[in-house]
Swiss-Prot record:
NCBIfam families: dnl1 (TIGR00574). Keywords: ATP-binding, Cell cycle, Cell division, DNA damage, DNA recombination, DNA repair, DNA replication, Ligase, Magnesium, Metal-binding, Nucleotide-binding. It comes from Methanothermobacter thermautotrophicus. DNA ligase that seals nicks in double-stranded DNA during DNA replication, DNA recombination and DNA repair. The lineage of its organism: Archaea, Methanobacteriati, Methanobacteriota, Methanomada group, Methanobacteria. One of its GO terms (biological process) is DNA recombination. PROSITE patterns: DNA_LIGASE_A1, DNA_LIGASE_A2, DNA_LIGASE_A3. It catalyses: ATP + (deoxyribonucleotide)n-3'-hydroxyl + 5'-phospho-(deoxyribonucleotide)m = (deoxyribonucleotide)n+m + AMP + diphosphate. One of its GO terms (molecular function) is DNA ligase (ATP) activity. ATP binds at residues 249, 256, 271, 301, 340, 417, 423. This is DNA ligase. The keyword ATP-binding applies. It comes from the Archaea.
Length: 557
């Protein structure tokens, strides 16, 4: 296998970071992908996203900024305070590391140039470090890598460890680069990525097997895909008129899950592709009883019901977050599952129309009332519009969010928000935004982050762009919890201002979207209010600048 020096990769990162032009980034990446040895291609592709594992992998590096700073301190020979000062000065741990490493006087004897294979294997080893001495093991691994790093390499190694590469490359740019590098249809690359959620695999297949190989990639139980997403309907009547015929379903206020059976193993994934099987034993037991022993992928919503009504979304988060005391929580906060789609049963079904997929779901599901059921659904057309209106009113009366309105002829399109699936809610539309910073309070509230700086994702560049500050909608306990999380994610603090690794997602309601030069997005939200914390979403799931602009133009705001 032809070696690839990590410095060569770092220089590519630097070129990507130095341009804002999408086409230029695409060509830089295509050039790299063409030149990389086939054995390294999947790893390099994932590294270009600033990740070490595919998004659906259960493996995590488990390294926070404090642990990383400790390793830098040992390698460079400076204090933690000096590192914090440099991060504050540079505004980024990568740039701070580069500056500190450029002043390093110690040299590792007999050090060899870092290779991508070595760096990648040692970063993966971080996820395997466990037990009583896990933190020490992780520090030793980081020191082993960083002690051989040159300043530019240190910039990108440290950013990769925190999964915050900051070179303006998103999945769309990498898909385009794969298509250009190996001269294959971009639509085939996009579809292959939607069905595998593994750009490393897609790149390898595109190179070795071309378009025929990409066409053969398909759904596989055990490997989750991003869910099909819904647009907001302005009214039930207009949605039914546009679709002609639709399945209308109760919109449950819970956590959307994808359940996979592969052989004897059943896995339950959230919308952010996180495996929560161990946290929801009653759901696992229920689906094993209610569904056949065939391989399948089904989709549904997990909710909590208390006193006959849906309970707060936060109760569900409490369940799926906990790794301990699961038996007690299972008794105190019991869960129910409502299934509404099947993506795979004895073969992929996503290209089949919804009406057929629903028939398959109902044929394989043996409902267990109160535990595992099919979603409540009515078949609606222009002639029986009243049935949809009845379902909406009934769903709201029972404490649910509203209804889903789905085109009966639509295939399942993973990861796409389109007009084949619509939602109509009693409450105004909201945005899912990511926290990038905040401001601490004063006086008795000086220990709490009282105002949160929010951002959307620019889908063209992949960058986060600020759009609002929000300071209302959170009770004191939630503020305390969020402030502790912010401190753990801290990248920089200056006075009362804090900047954090973008990880916390808030669902925010607002009265209006307006143009504003104050924020990087060019837009702002009037009277924003936090509706809930969205720990069921990943940073890739947040709303985009394109959606904000669309809402602004349509006047939904």
């Amino acid at each position: 296998m032809k070696e690839l020096l990590y410095m060569e990769l770092a220089e590519v990162y630097h070129r990507l970071e130095s341009t804002t032009k999408r086409l230029e980034k695409t060509e830089i990446l295509a050039e790299l992908l063409r030149s990389v040895d086939k054995e390294l291609l999947p790893d390099v592709t994932i590294l270009m996203l600033g990740r070490v594992f595919p998004i659906w992998s259960e493996e995590e590096l488990g390294v926070g900024i404090k642990l990383l700073m400790k390793a830098i301190s040992l390698v460079v020979g400076v204090s933690m305070d000096e590192i914090e000062d440099e991060i504050r000065e540079q505004g980024d741990i990568g740039l701070a590391s580069e500056k500190l490493f450029s002043r390093k006087t110690q040299t590792t004897f007999f050090s060899q140039p870092l290779t991508v294979e070595f760096v990648y294997s040692r970063l993966k080893a971080l996820a395997s470090a466990s037990g009583d001495r896990a933190q020490s093991k992780k520090i030793n691994i980081l020191v082993e890598v960083l002690s051989q790093a040159k300043p530019l390499e240190a910039r990108y190694i440290t950013r990769t460890v925190l999964e915050e590469l900051r070179v303006g490359v998103a999945e769309g740019i990498i898909r385009d680069a794969i298509a250009r590098a190996f001269e294959v249809d971009p639509a085939l690359v996009e579809r292959a990525h939607m069905l595998t959620n593994d750009l490393g695999m897609v790149a390898a297949v595109a190179r070795e097997e071309g378009e025929p190989g990409l066409g053969r990639l398909n759904l596989e139980p055990g490997r989750p895909v991003k869910p099909m997403l819904a647009q907001l309907a302005s009214s039930i009547e207009s949605a039914i008129t546009e679709l002609g015929r639709a399945f209308c379903e109760t919109k449950y206020d819970g956590i959307r899950v994808q359940i996979h059976r592969c052989g004897d193993e059943v896995s339950i994934f959230t919308r952010r592709l996180e495996n929560i099987t161990a946290a929801v034993p009653e759901i696992l037991e229920g689906v094993e009883e209610a569904l056949p022993a065939d391989d399948y992928i089904v989709e549904g919503e997990i909710i909590v019901t208390m006193d006959g009504r849906p309970a707060s979304f936060q109760y569900i988060l409490q369940r799926v977050r906990r790794k301990y005391d699961v038996d007690r929580l299972t008794r105190e906060v019991p869960l129910s599952l409502f299934l509404f789609d099947v993506l795979y049963h004895r073969g992929p079904l996503i290209d089949e129309p919804l009406w057929h997929r629903r028939e398959v779901l109902e044929s394989i599901l043996s409902e267990i009332p109160g535990r595992v059921e099919a979603s409540r659904m009515v078949d609606v057309g222009p002639d029986n519009l009243d049935d949809a209106l009845w379902l909406f009113k009934e769903s709201i009366r029972e404490g649910h969010e509203g209804i889903m309105i789905k085109d009966t002829e639509a295939p399942y399109i993973p990861g796409i928000r389109g007009k084949k699936m619509l939602k109509f809610k009693a409450e105004p539309e909201t945005l899912d935004l990511i926290v990038v910073g905040g401001t601490y309070g004063r006086g008795k509230r000086a220990h709490l982050v009282g105002s949160y700086l929010l951002a959307v994702r620019d889908e063209k560049s992949g960058e986060l762009k600020t759009i609002a500050h929000v300071a209302t909608g959170l009770d004191d306990q939630t503020l305390q919890d969020l402030s502790e999380r912010m401190e753990n994610l801290k990248v920089e603090r200056r006075g009362r201002k804090i900047r954090v690794k973008p990880e916390i997602i808030l669902e925010v309601a607002y009265s209006e979207i307006v143009r504003s030069p104050e924020y990087e997005s060019g837009y702002s939200l009037r009277f924003p209010v936090v509706k809930r914390i969205r720990d069921d979403l990943s940073p890739d799931d947040i709303d985009t600048l394109g959606r904000v602009i669309s809402l602004f133009k349509q006047g939904f705001s």
